[in-house]
Amino acid sequence: MTGDLQAAEVILCCGRGLQNKRNLNLAFRVADCIQAQIAGTRAAVDLGWIPANREIGLSGARVEPQIYIGCGVSGTNFHTMGMKHAKKIIAINTDPLAPIFQIADIRIEEDVCKVLFALMHTFSEKNSLQPSSIHHPSVDELLAFFDR
């Protein structure tokens, strides 16, 4: 994982709600597809899924991307202190009481893998229509996907 979290336009943050490394690998593939920087919660770091230098929160980085996508992130105060100034906060979680939903601009109460597969399919399909050049979605295209 490379890239500067502070300079990122789009951050895909992985939380314990991803449940396992297979789902984490899906998140990595989606991040690559949409040109997002990968980050994680303290729980994801403690599980060894994400390096400590990619943690967002009180004991990690404070970021202000155009879009923050929380995948299986519950949204403890320690975490939200590091990302609450994102321009758009998109939260994907099956728990309707997840604290992150209180600050999210877009709330998706659904299985995170289902949403990630749809996201990857949408933008991979656009790439197959333009085989000569890889199309990475703009911030507006990503927001349009989530606003449906």
Task: Report the location of each language-model feature.
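N-terminal glycine-rich FAD/FM-binding segment characteristic of electron-transfer flavoproteins
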Residues: 1-148
